[in-house]
From Swiss-Prot:
Pfam families: IGPD
Keyword Membrane: no
Species, as recorded: Pseudomonas syringae pv. tomato (strain ATCC BAA-871 / DC3000)
Annotated metabolic or biological route of this protein: Amino-acid biosynthesis; L-histidine biosynthesis; L-histidine from 5-phospho-alpha-D-ribose 1-diphosphate: step 6/9
Protein name, UniProt field: Imidazoleglycerol-phosphate dehydratase
Length: 197
């Protein structure tokens, strides 16, 4: 089996990012981004998706976190697109429900080749530890646009904003794991009647 790994560098006037990914990893993660809450959430993707992630980012954090969060999403999306290749033999679809105390979230993903995001998270607070939680919409939009996936995110209940977000990212990791997993019964076939994704 060919290695499903990727390394992406993305440099703009706002951020300089290096990201490496291994879709068939063990959940190892290393981050040097400068936004601790984002790093905590990315760790959920790695550990629950069994995806190795290594991300370094130097961003214009003196302004705010916006460019860093969005551009990390873009770069991770690009890395996924490279690592997954032609998509032959993958399950394509993934979904997960994840609870954390009072919070419950559902994430459904399709490696369809068609970018689309539906994200419904009724945050109970605007910030967690000084982090603007609205920025996660930018992270996921960046990911979707560059991984070329359809992604539905729903927080079904929750009163603690940290729990709401953490269940989203854990479910996202688990849905990714399911979708990118190779299906022996597919025997390298394209998971689409069109023959292309």
């Amino acid at each position: 089996m060919a290695e499903r790994k990727a390394y992406v560098e993305r440099n703009t006037l706002e951020t300089q990012i290096k990201a490496s990914i291994n879709l068939d990893g063990t959940g190892k993660a290393r981050f040097d981004i400068g936004v601790p809450f984002l790093e905590h959430m990315l760790d959920q993707i790695a550990r629950h998706g069994l995806i190795d992630l290594d991300i370094e980012c130097k961003g214009d954090l003196a302004i705010d976190d916006h460019h860093t969060v969005e551009d990390v999403g873009i770069t991770v999306g690009q890395a996924f697109s490279q690592a997954i290749g032609d998509k032959k033999g993958i399950r394509r679809y993934g979904h997960a429900y994840v609870p954390l105390d009072e919070a419950l979230s559902r994430v459904v993903i399709d490696f369809s080749g068609r970018p689309g995001l539906q994200m419904h998270v009724p945050y109970t607070r605007a910030t967690v530890g000084g982090f603007d939680v609205d920025l996660f919409q930018e992270f996921f939009q960046g990911f979707v646009n560059h991984a070329n996936v359809t992604l539905h995110i729903d927080n079904l209940r929750g009163t603690n904003t940290h729990h709401q977000i953490e269940t989203v990212f854990k479910a996202f990791g688990r849905a990714l794991r399911m979708a990118v997993e190779l299906d022996e019964r597919m025997a390298g076939q394209m998971p689409s009647t069109k023959g292309v994704l």
